[in-house]
Amino acid sequence: MAGHSQFKNIMHRKGRQDAVKSKMFSKLAREITVAAKAGLPDPAMNPRLRLAVQNARAQSMPKDNIERAIKKAQGNDAETYEEIRYEGYAPGGVAVIVEALTDNRNRTASNVRAAFTKAGGALGETGSVSFMFDRVGEIVYPASAGDADKVMEAAIEAGAEDVQSDENGHVIICAFEDIGEVTSALEEALGEAESVKTVWRPQTSTPVDEERAQSILKLIAVLEDDDDVQNVYANFEVDDATMAKLSAA
């Protein structure tokens, strides 16, 4: 029976992974549709759409899905999505920013507020925590793009502000308004990036213990599980040993 049990566990895990991938594709498709509707349906002529398509490809989203999302924006029956930012505090006074694309503002606000309340946090007003973050461009390259020195040199030449390199790859940070220019310059030097996006980068991080970290990670997981939520950012910090323990749980 042990073998049967193991098979069931593997299939359950695969099912969970497939569900996560399906939800991710759905969110990527929504961003593509919104980007295509906001400008031209040609990625070459629409920087936001180009980035959305590039990020979808980096996540192995099928070409048919990408094309369908672009075409959806051109139809008369295309949903109208609104970009909304929610801000609040998780347990321990940790600041959280939630970015959403929604066709029903009331539904999304209700879901986000409920998630904060259940976690022991509180949803605040727009602007209540965003001053603790910087809006920046984040360009990610795989380790195969080159060693740290090569990537650092290319990033400086491109006008980036910061580079973080490790065995997993390279994360390049640039000013929000420079993301298009920096991305193009990096492509010439290093090829196409793995992902390009704008993010909210914490100016400082709040250290939290294992119990608080568990509550915060649970809140983030609940928020990210919502179909309307695109991104979640938080300014907390956990030591490596605690994070490894929580990841293994």
UniProtKB/Swiss-Prot annotation:
Per the annotation, which location comes first and is thus the protein's main one?
Answer: cytoplasm
Q: Which GO terms describe its molecular function?
A: DNA binding
Q: Which domain of life is it from?
A: Bacteria
The cross-references to Gene3D superfamilies, in alphabetical order and at most eight, read: 1.10.10.200, 3.30.70.980
The UniProt entry's GO biological process terms, in alphabetical order, are: regulation of DNA-templated transcription
Q: What cellular-component terms does GO give this entry?
A: cytosol
Q: Where does it localize? A: Cytoplasm
Query: Record's Pfam families?
Result: TACO1_YebC_N, Transcrip_reg
Q: Which InterPro entries match?
A: Integrase-like_N, TACO1_YebC-like_2nd/3rd_dom, TACO1_YebC_N, Transcrip_reg_TACO1-like, Transcrip_reg_TACO1-like_dom3, YebC-like
PANTHER family annotated for this entry? TRANSCRIPTIONAL REGULATORY PROTEIN YEBC-RELATED, TRANSLATIONAL ACTIVATOR OF CYTOCHROME C OXIDASE 1
Q: Which family does it belong to?
A: Belongs to the TACO1 family.
Protein name in UniProt: Probable transcriptional regulatory protein Meso_3192
Provenance organism: Chelativorans sp. (strain BNC1)
